[in-house]
A protein has these predicted regions:
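Short, well-ordered coil/turn elements that cap or connect secondary structure elements
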Residues: 17-20, 55, 82
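Hydrophobic anchor at the start of a short beta-strand
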Residues: 22, 60, 85-86
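Hydrophobic residues at beta-strand termini and immediately following loops
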Residues: 25, 63, 88
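A donor-sugar binding/catalytic signature common to diverse glycosyltransferases
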Residues: 31-74
Length: 140
């Protein structure tokens, strides 16, 4: 899944480099389900994709985009430090390194059950606490 922002020339190159059993697409409806069902995932470190990965027990290797911002690299390093994903820099993501990682990853699952996933409910509670009327009926 190349993503909707990949330019046409890069998409054509990716398609031409793909092997006979590989399909390159821009988008993939139902990606969360495919991540859950996959033996392993190699991905860039975009926010939405990483959230989908963290919701599954699929082993994941994140190869973060390093320019124009370090956002993905920072995210990948933090998650790797918590032993939730593996990460490689773009320079280290050679075919050999990717193959080595895949060979080990496809026989395992990653336990991410310790991740607190109640952020939406916690945010709603915090907002309600901040705007709840005080004893005089005034908003705090």
């Amino acid at each position: 899944v190349a993503g909707p922002q990949l330019d046409d020339a890069s998409m054509e190159r990716a398609c031409s480099l793909a092997g006979p059993t590989t399909t390159v697409v821009r988008t993939c409806p139902g990606l969360a389900h495919r991540i859950r069902e996959a033996a392993a995932v190699i991905s860039m470190g975009g926010y939405n994709t990483v959230c989908e990965i963290l919701a599954a027990d699929t082993p994941a290797l994140i190869v973060p985009r390093e320019v124009p911002r370090l956002e993905q690299t920072i995210r990948a390093r933090a998650l790797a430090g918590a032993h939730l994903i593996d990460t490689l820099s773009q320079a280290d993501a050679t075919p050999e390194a990717l193959s080595r990682w895949l060979n080990g990853a496809v026989t395992t699952r990653t336990d991410r059950s310790r991740i607190a996933r109640g952020g939406l409910a916690a945010a709603a509670h915090a907002a309600m606490t901040l705007i709840a009327p005080d004893n005089d009926g005034d908003l705090q």
